[in-house]
Amino acid sequence: MAREAGLHSAQIKILRELLFMPTARFAELQKASGLESDHVKFHIKQLVKLGYVNKIGNAYQLSVTGKEYANKLDTDAGVIERQPKVAVLLVVEQHNPKTHMVEYLLQKRLKHPYFSFWGAPTGKVRWGETLLDTATRELKEETGLTGTFEYRGIYHERVRHQETGEIIEDKLFQLMFCDRFSGKLQVKFDGGHNAWRTLEDMMLEPKKYKGFETEIAACLNSIPLTERIYNYSDSEF
């Protein structure tokens, strides 16, 4: 867990105090922060300026933004909890009429981390966005295709640093399936390369995400929840 960048530890303590009170006076916030009066005044002013705290007469209270932010606090440790990334993972399927094979739209990643690794397209869920909207947007942005998606389950993957044992990634992928789409495939995009490949071909691919087969199978079989942990070395990540 780590404190969110930009907030002083004293400001975190003030937010924590306000989390459990409808309003609080200056003396109560000073006691919670453990700082001298002038320093507390500075930090309260900063929180007001950031929009986390409102001043009501001689008292202070959390704003709507402040309530949402403070709700992420680990109240025992007094820090903002680090949370998994939420993203969609797109499994886009087609039947090739020439080869009579089932193919999947896959990407070669040309940016860090996982440079040159092959896998299914993914994308972060934006604030306030539905999963279907995210899947549709990501497909259009990265491939030029327009598709219709259905939700298939959750794939929770943690990545552990092989040398240190530290968890370096924690991701909640919403599995989204599509076999109805239109448009012309955009082969190159900023940070990657698109291609239709079969699962048989991917079995021979030396550089693919370690969870590739698991996540594809989870989506195709509509498994509600799949959780895995994989080790990656410095050279792989």
Residue ranges and their predicted role:
Residues 23, 35, 99-141, 145:
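Conserved Nudix-box catalytic region and its N-terminal flanking loop in Nudix hydrolases
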Residues 125-149, 156-212:
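Unchanged
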Residues 1-14, 36, 74, 80:
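Short alpha-helical segments that sit at the start of domains
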Residues 33-49:
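Short amphipathic alpha-helical interaction segments
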